[in-house]
Amino acid sequence: MDSVSASGAQRQDEGLRERIRSSQAVDVNAVDQALATAGYGVTTDSRKNDNKKTFGRTPDGTVFTVPQTHDMVSQLLSPTEPKTVSDFVVLAILATHILIFVALAPEARISVFAAIYMFWRTSYNGGIGWLLHNQSHHNTMVRWATKSKIFVNPSTGENPHPTLYRLLKRDMETMIPEDYSFDDAPLEYNTWLVFRRIVDVILMCDFASYCLFALACGSRPENETALMTTLRWAAGWVLVLFNLWVKLDAHRVVKDFAWYWGDFFFLIDQELTFDGVFEMAPHPMYSVGYAGYYGISLMAASYKVLFISIIAHAAQFAFLVLVENPHIDRVYNPPPPRKRSIQHDSKDLHALNNSQTSPISDSFPATPDDKAAMRQPAPSSVHNLLGLHNLDLHRVTDSSVILIQLLVFALTVLTPSTPFYQYLFVANAAIWRCWYSIGIGYILHRQSKYKSWTRHFVKYGENTDEAWRQWKGSYHLSMTMCYASFIAATWKMYTMPSDWNHGLALLKHTLGFSLVALQIWTSVSIYDSLGEFGWFFGDFFFDAQSKLTYSGIYRFLNNPERVLGLAGLWGAALITSKGAIIFLALLSHVLTLAFIQLVERPHMQKLYGRSLRQDAGLVKSLKRSLPPPLQQLGGSVDRMMDESFEFVEELLDSARPKLATGVNTFMKDAKSLFRQYPARITISRLDDEVAAGYDLEDYSLEIEGTESSPSAQVERSSGKEGVHARAPPERRGDLKSLIFEYGAPIRVKWTAPLNHSKRDWVGLYMVTDNTRREVTRVSSQGRWIATNEGAYDSLTCEKGLISSDIVISASRRRDGENRDLASGEMVFSGDKLFWTTGVFEFRYHHNGKHNVMAISRPFEIRIGRFDEDDVLNMDNNTTSSNSDAIIQAAIEEALLPVVRNCFDRDPEIAPETYDEHFGSLVDRDGKYAKRVVFAVHQMFGIELAPEVVRADGNVRNMAWRICNAKKVLAPYSMSRSRGTSTPTTQEKELS
């Protein structure tokens, strides 16, 4: 696409501080009505001013006016802003840092302030990260505020902290003089205000302690000239000022709401415009927003400051990946609506079941949906190549790549680093780079113009999918060899510094490895944006989309591989400081630019024409900041580059016939030459309350679940046992063994004394995991539910809770006791279940600890095996022509309830019919497909990859695939009725 709209669903790669516009526009009349209901006055005369206000929306739907607030620095340091008690506390802490710095001896300042800074940095990335993670998943901070009642007016008599209430009210209303009332504001907003004051303390102390640490480490290197000192300080100040501009411009765009992670608490209904720094780089607050750290390191001329800056920067990226990005995906990028089932008439379904497939090279013929997919422009991506998680040694491409890499590694390590071998490795790297750029470029150029690669495979009866697979393998092998040979050459040319403190050795290694990391990040970002199809130039082989999509790193750069994608090569050149590696890096850069200009660009222009954008976000921002004469100069340079490449193209076109003639002559001579010359002790500590008087007879657990299929019951006595064990077991009571369906929800009913602890909880365990009945010694791993709502600072532990503390009178007790009981119900489903087979039990625990008060009956989760012989024997109309259709229909019937269980019976993703498509969340979260894979393996003995489940997309396609897989594997089966097996005695006699 030409440009990407700024909707939250489409900017998933942005940082949290780049909050996107709301999902819907504000209905002013509805807002006025909601505000009036909440007690806010809205008059007709103020209609014009209302359009400038920001409205917030809490998770429960409450709409409120979000008042204007000021940034942290202005609030603390501006004399025009009113000061609060918390402001003076922050200023006092900052002053304490300065006093400590002055009081310490110079030699002690470095270690002390390194420790202080790391404390505040850990508080930032670890402490704030932990708070935000729990707020995002469990609404923890708001629940704390609710339980502590610190925002409840003391006049009601419910607030146990009236002094804290008055202090917070005075501070907040002083800090926000307009459009704000502490008593009327929503709980979420007040909680956010308190949270941002904590953030103010941490951020200010983090930056202040860093600056003091840099000041303690600052020095001037020996023998440094005045010119070098001037340049060093000038470059440092440029980076610091650039950092300051990034922060100010980012705050101008996102305001305090996103600056302080406001959408972890509430959302705003407002259109946000993102420009400036957000067009320059991804996550500018965390990427280019840390340039000042390196500027300060440069001015301090200290490796200590540089390395602690790198550690802080890495911690910030970890904070982004682990805390912010998951929240962004959950809030702003929900799964799209699922595809509903498409109704077919009976004739279509009959034709679908009885369709015959033509022989193809794959072991599994294409399913009905696969046949439709073959008419689509792009192939389905099931068995990807890139990434260690996609490594498959059964695939010839992967095994070849691994073997060749081992060979390169062995040659690199075992050969000496003499000039001869150095020259050999450098020449090898140059040859592979030439092949990777020129050879691959020639193939793609021919494919773009004449479809020559595809035509070759069609000539031998193959299809486009086979051509695509072979191309991916060739390109993947070429790419890995290109970089492996470069790494080998770098290793041969590298010499370990004898003195790391001499010269710029340490700095060059640091910058070099940083450039390598930058190239790795760029490659990962490119792959995330393009996918497997784009990475392997899929639009050279299949019809492309009518509109380009600029997402991810391509929002900022048109061709990121042109500069950032080669940063690691220059990093290696910087580390080795050898002319040969510099030559390889320069050669690689020139060839890559030529590949983009001569191969990629013409093809993209042919496909997309005017829809190709001219300038990316970064270029637009830079052009806007340049004066008009320099902008014209940039256009002139672009024209000169285009004319130069056109001249080179014309030169190559004119020389091609002569080169072709020479190559043919060389090949003939070479062939003639080859023809001529062939040749422990456990002590359990019980809670005092348990020993003090709780009667264990008052506690009980009863469970209900969906019984497993009859085949699962039969498999317990299948003829493999001794003679006496084949008969059903004799039972002396009316209770039978509990065998439940795989993945089906399990309802748990509990009873406890009326005065039981509100922090009691029930957990699910495997029977073999706990050897003691009175104490649980294994963690529940999230498979637990609290008996009462609000007892824990987590929403997850309340998921599945149905009822609590329903009184059961003594007259209804079965054991004859005369005490009333409390009871409740809960349902374990989804992530609270074990997704495997085995024997399990529920345990009731006391007061948030692991003392066991009651244990349920053990129950088994078993998946019955599918027996096609039974299916055929039950159908009297079975013939050889319709047996496959009957078996496939039976597989569909057996598979549908299992798939629904694997998808948590969620109406958004679980299918209702055989043809209904799976929800899009199945593609995002791999756990659902892995559950189905396990169930299919247990039921049918067929092992599928999770990617196949996602690609099939519905139960009918999966049933078809399983049916055909069983047919393919039938010759290797020991079944009597299916496939070619060893002849039986009767068959021998008949023969």
Curated annotation (Swiss-Prot):
It is found in: Endoplasmic reticulum membrane. Pathway: Phospholipid metabolism; phosphatidylcholine biosynthesis. GO terms for biological process: methylation; phosphatidylcholine biosynthetic process. This is Phosphatidylethanolamine N-methyltransferase. Residues 1-21, 352-376, 705-730 are annotated as: Disordered. Keywords: Endoplasmic reticulum, Lipid biosynthesis, Lipid metabolism, Membrane, Methyltransferase, Phospholipid biosynthesis, Phospholipid metabolism, S-adenosyl-L-methionine, Transferase, Transmembrane, Transmembrane helix. It catalyses: a 1,2-diacyl-sn-glycero-3-phosphoethanolamine + S-adenosyl-L-methionine = a 1,2-diacyl-sn-glycero-3-phospho-N-methylethanolamine + S-adenosyl-L-homocysteine + H(+). Disulfide bonds: none annotated. It comes from Talaromyces stipitatus (strain ATCC 10500 / CBS 375.48 / QM 6759 / NRRL 1006).
